[in-house]
Amino acid sequence: MTEVKVKKGESIDKALRRLKRKLDREGTLREARLRKAFEKPCNRRRRKAKEARLKLYSSLY
């Protein structure tokens, strides 16, 4: 479980921003959204291939 401790004198908004950034880096929210509904194996392979193409394309430019 991901934890973010609120530092002394730190606002709640700042702590929430740190939590969101940490969850984004870990991919927790993204994985939860993907697992919300069943995804067929063929659709999963297709999605992963598309993500790989987009990642490769964006790294070239």
UniProtKB/Swiss-Prot annotation:
PROSITE patterns: RIBOSOMAL_S21. InterPro entries: Ribosomal_bS21, Ribosomal_bS21_CS, Ribosomal_bS21_sf. GO terms for biological process: translation. Keywords: Ribonucleoprotein, Ribosomal protein. Pfam families: Ribosomal_S21. It comes from the Bacteria. One of its GO terms (cellular component) is ribosome. Disulfide bonds: none annotated. One of its GO terms (molecular function) is structural constituent of ribosome. Belongs to the bacterial ribosomal protein bS21 family. This is Small ribosomal subunit protein bS21. The lineage of its organism: Bacteria, Pseudomonadati, Verrucomicrobiota, Methylacidiphilae, Methylacidiphilales.
